Amino acid sequence: PLRVQPVLAYHLYSKREMTSWRPWGGLHNENDIAEEKERIAKELKKMADSAEFGIDILPLIPVTNAEQAAKVAKGNHDVLLMYAANSGLDVLEALTNPDKWTIMFVRMKSGPVYLWYEIAHNRYLRKTVDEYGQPGMDYQDVVVDDYGEILWRLRALNGLKNTLGKRIVALGGPGGWGHG
């Protein structure tokens, strides 16, 4: 089965007098985080139950700093499913291992809005310049709100995992349908 490691990347900010201290997004305290973890667990179970291929969803790991993220990125999984809530860029970069598959999930309407819904493209993927700069990721690896979109990506990655490194016999030579 395809081993999927879900990760909730977040940061809780402390109140600071006479300044703007709240982060952008909908996760502001431990209660919000607990509710989000529960929401993610339910959504992942529903998605896994609907999958028609072998999938092993590992327990959700919360990460709040780059050191934790780097350790998780090296873990024993095929796909890292990153819930990019409101963590720093350094955390997301540490979670992304170019040698493994990564899918970023962000919320706009399906729960508390995530900061990275607003800035994933310009800050994470493009690094505030015109060219893409995040190794191992592009805009097609970012999913907004839709677990059906995650599931078809996981289905494709499962097929790829089960094909890579295998011998394939093509009778009459390799080919497909159509002209040419």
Question: Where would I find each of the regions flagged by the language model?
Answer:
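An N-terminal assembly and electron-transfer interface module characteristic of large anaerobic redox
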Residues: 1-180
